[in-house]
């Protein structure tokens, strides 16, 4: 009798628990709220440097501490975004073609991961500033690279890196935001 009662209770519990129809509904999309600071800038104009430009107030200028660092190499560090723009400077000594080729090679090295690479030229004849900004879409290690020159004496190359695994769709808001800062840097760049 006890066995029969126990078995009846188990069967009833199983039937009752399976008979309820649950209403299922898709979960709504959730997006991370990103509070970006206002684009405001300050001037980098070190007396010893051959160039000057404006950079965001929420970024820091750091000396490049790499073993192969040359004079006037710096990083613009974005602590809130875990990103860094590496700036390298070279004096032009009949090697402009080599510097431009190296710049293009470093950009197109990323074709394996980049879905698209576009180039935009910037020209400021009055300041002798000539620049090309490369935008790399997709999961490339760097979303922006650029070079700036006066075509006779000075050459600066820059690249943006995030200190996280490159996932373009996740990083896109940050890439777009810092992209505006890079454009501003190029537009305010001047030689001394």
What are these regions (language model features)?
Residues 1-4:
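Positively charged n-region of N-terminal signal peptides that target proteins for export
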Residues 14-17:
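C-terminal motif of bacterial Sec signal peptides marking the signal peptidase cleavage site
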Residues 19-22:
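Bacterial signal peptide processing site
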Residues 27-47:
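Post-signal peptide N-terminal segment of mature Sec-exported envelope proteins
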Residues 48-101:
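Secretory pathway targeting signatures of secreted, lumenal, and periplasmic proteins
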Residues 102-159:
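Signature of long, low-cysteine stretches enriched in small and polar/charged residues
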Residues 159-192:
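Surface-exposed amphipathic alpha-helical segments
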